[in-house]
Amino acid sequence: MSSNKQPGLPTEVSYNEAVEASKKYFDGDDLAATVWVSKYALKDSYGHIYEKTPRDMHERIAAEIERIEKKYPNPMNRQEVFELLDHFRYIIPQGGPMTGIGNNFQAASLSNCFVIGHKNPADSYGGIFRMDEEQVQLMKRRGGVGHDLSHIRPTGSPVLNSALTSTGIVPFMERYSNSTREVAQDGRRGALMLTLSIKHPDAERFIDAKVDTSKVTGANVSVKIDDEFMRAALAGKKYYQQFPIHSDKPLYQQDIDAKKLWDKIIHNAWKSAEPGVMFWDTIIRESIPDCYADEGFTTVATNPCGEIPLCPYDSCRLLAINLLSYVDKPFTKEASFNFEKFKQHVEKAMRMMDDIIDLELEKVELIINKIAADPEDEDIRRVELELWKKIRTMARKGRRTGLGITAEGDMLAALGLRYGTPEATAFAVKVQKTLALEAYRATVKMAAERGAFEIFDARKEEKNPMIGRIREADPELYAEMVKHGRRNIAMLTIAPTGTTSLMSQTTSGIEPVFRPVYKRRRKINPSDQDAKVAFVDDMGEKFEEYNVYHHNFVKWLEANGYDTSKLQDISDDELNRWVAASPYHGATANDIDWVAKVKMQGEIQKWVDHSISVTVNLPNDVSEALVADVYRTAWECGCKGVTVYRDGCREGVLIDKKKKAAKEENGQTILKRPKSIPADIVRFKNGNENWIAFVGLQDGRPYEIFTGKIEEDAMYIPPKINKGFIIKVREENGSKRYDFQYIDRYGYTNTIGGISRLFNEEFWNYAKLISGVLRHGMPITNVVSLIESLHLNSETINTWKLGVERALKQYISDGTKTKDKCPSCGQETMAYQNGCLTCMSCGYSKCG
């Protein structure tokens, strides 16, 4: 590791320079290089890059971990930490810790996820809107957020205001969803999880909320199901709903046909992949933090991906261990798992996780100080300030961590075990059990050296099932825990590792390999007469196909004497024989038995004190009965949650409702523009300059867009204004102009006349062209693709182009599929989730 770096004086590097250097670091893997530079390289608030390769990032992280380690006995040094991180070989921080540790340019949290809520039920408008503001404040600092809606009174119940009756859950789902869509996090929207108890009288409305794919597009939704409901549904009995859901004297009660509602959950999951299901009694029964409910640790919701159930104002940071790196002599008959090295590294990973909590507390303190010093009125700052103080309190009290794993599929293949078989599942459970015991051993050791989390009480935990399994597996460890306590209230999870696995060049999380071989297409140069045409697209463009291989399938070939120099020209028949001989044969995402996979998840879950985020990917032609079988099996075998995704279930883009057309051109219906249409404001950076986009909407869909540089002396719009109207005005001489109108905080209408005159003519003309395409109804995904394909000479215009793409992507509904091939697995299964193009097959994401 280099020793002459000066952390206080970073040197700026260009994007292309960083990509080229990182491509060499990743042995020519340009996808891994571009993902790392785009998402994880050190950047300032203007997007300037200060790291060339992941080595620089790992040195940055190692230096900060060493600084914290020096506070405690037996510290790890920088070199020791760096070697664990280097080349993503052993220990991989995920998301926030990778981008934020040692980043002094931005006041942002290191936490991946948060949950918010009220200490006491609060279903007033004040309580509902405070939740909305807290959600936005967390998302602006890169946090994913979850919260529960079960405290909101059901539809039709009386309220003591002029409305007389409650609107119920769904309008507030839409409100929280819209807030998520509006908050930019490094070019993408925030991530949100909304949950509701099945016991709530509005549960059916909640379950149906996303059947219309134009609704609640900025949130994942999951229904919290209790054991009583499951027993009633499977037995065909009645189930009682009430509000408040935990009250001994509810204000409202109703009985329902549990089987009918269960069938609706299954149908909607089959049809649109939502809602997800959380088995809430299992979560609470297994939750160690809930042993401290009297201290505020009552679990109420999960983070957006579902792997961390949390209490209000608690947070978590994620880190994954690369299991493949512990296989000695991989892909040979002598292959074995190095449990001794694994145990040592689990202890070090837990120390690093605890150090990251200290680093997070420093970041939170900076955020609190920044808010306190802001010039805005105290009453404006109050909610955000109190929010971060609550987060600081919960982080100090519990010191929660999120240690997980990745490369499960590759580890099993390297050992000669076929994913999904009983032998492979048994070994996977053995590894997870070892991880759990060593993580608990490490946290007990840290409690002795550093002190236990401040509310530890062994008596409160003694009946917890997870603690019981620890006690039974290792009585001596349990005795030490009773004596010294634990450093951390809860520690383990298995989170999605989409982009993480791209950089470690392994399978993701506990998932199998998607395919060991897939095909990519390359456009043929018209002058290349010898190219073999494999595909011609709608525009007449010709493509050739070539094979792309999973990194570790190639390692298996090399370890077993195959001539890998033949790979680019190999015949399909010979390649199929090679695949059939490999441990990946019959063990891909499409090969394994889906119900067996859920059973494997349930067995591993016994040794994970939080939860596991897994989506069961199903082919398009599966029946609803199979989805029901997957969900029922998940409950029976102890899973804490389950989500399914049936291929193509959300295919297509939204079609506006039919409206009276003003005219038709060449068979194309064109909607007449009203004089005034609603508009959203999207602000973005073009280089170092502040730019703005006005997006005019028809039926919630972009109809026109005007963009340019913000000139405050000519066009001042308060930062908190994000909505208004674009008004088309016809002058006496026949010319037209566009005005922007908004309502300020005092309720007065403000109009900015002729916004076109305020923008550079070149940008205005490009925006007019894009608006013309939007008005003719081209799907937003196609418009974004069209803009992405523009090759413009000016760097300023190219930066502007990225801002326009970002603005329009906010209006692409989750689940909207594109014809794009996934750059990781090569499948045409790319769909938009939270504004990010995500592969529904392998988990690759352009954003997250």
Name the predicted role of every residue range.
Residues 100-110, 114-115, 125-148, 183, ...:
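Conserved phosphate/anionic-ligand binding catalytic regions in large, soluble enzymes, centered on
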